[in-house]
Regions:
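Sec-dependent N-terminal signal peptides
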Residues: 3-16
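Active-site-proximal flexible loops/turns
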Residues: 9, 74, 154
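Residue-level marker of intrinsically disordered, low-complexity segments enriched
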Residues: 12-14, 33, 141-142
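His/Glu-rich zincin catalytic helix
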Residues: 17-86, 108-111, 117-127, 181-182
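Acidic/histidine-enriched segments that form metal/cofactor-coordinating
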Residues: 51, 77-78, 84-182
Length: 182
């Protein structure tokens, strides 16, 4: 009982010192939620978009599509040539990445603070004007297969870390039993 009390007090003390993050939340007419948070300690801006779609939305026997589309949406848009996404980001002093989980797919770009409009434009391009063609499908299919080989198939404990060895047993009927990577 004494250990429980000390543990509880420890976690209570952590919560007392936790900082609340100030943000503004807007819901646009199209249903898009926009969260704004200003933090002036670094001269950078991050534009991120989270889509509420992930591996849980797939069907048994056909997994990995959310992750695959995460990759495809870097292939180019109506106004961004194929293969130029990363060039635009890096030539403007930025970095970017994306990831997929059971519940969502997340993209972000971090730029110097004077490039907010560029980040917003790039994410709007990804959302409104993606180009998905056979070249991109073939390219990203190989990229995703290589990612699976590196992270799961050929990595010690990879199947444990990425859940492919455990999740089907933990979540017998729940959508989380499906592999994210495919």
């Amino acid at each position: 009982m004494k250990n429980f009390l000390y543990t509880s007090l420890f976690f209570l003390a952590l919560n007392i010192n936790a900082q609340l993050i100030d943000y503004e939340l807007y819901t646009l007419d199209n249903g898009l939620d926009v969260i704004l948070h200003q933090e002036n300690s670094s001269p950078v801006v991050t534009v991120s978009v989270m889509y509420h779609v992930g591996a849980k939305d797939e069907v048994d026997g056909r997994t990995g599509f959310a992750h695959f589309f995460e990759h495809l949406l870097f292939e180019g848009t109506k106004n961004i040539e194929r293969g130029k996404w990363f060039d635009i980001v890096s030539s403007n002093g930025g970095s970017n990445n994306a990831n997929t989980s059971h519940d969502r797919t997340y993209y972000y770009e971090t730029f110097p603070s004077n490039s907010l409009e560029l980040g917003l434009w790039m994410e709007s391009e990804r959302m409104l004007h993606p180009i998905i063609n056979q070249i991109g499908v073939d390219t990203q299919n190989e990229v995703v297969k290589e990612e699976k080989r590196q992270r799961i198939d050929n990595a010690p404990y990879g199947a444990l870390i990425y859940g492919t060895a455990v999740d089907p047993y933990l979540y017998k009927k729940h959508p989380y039993r499906r592999s994210i990577i495919g």
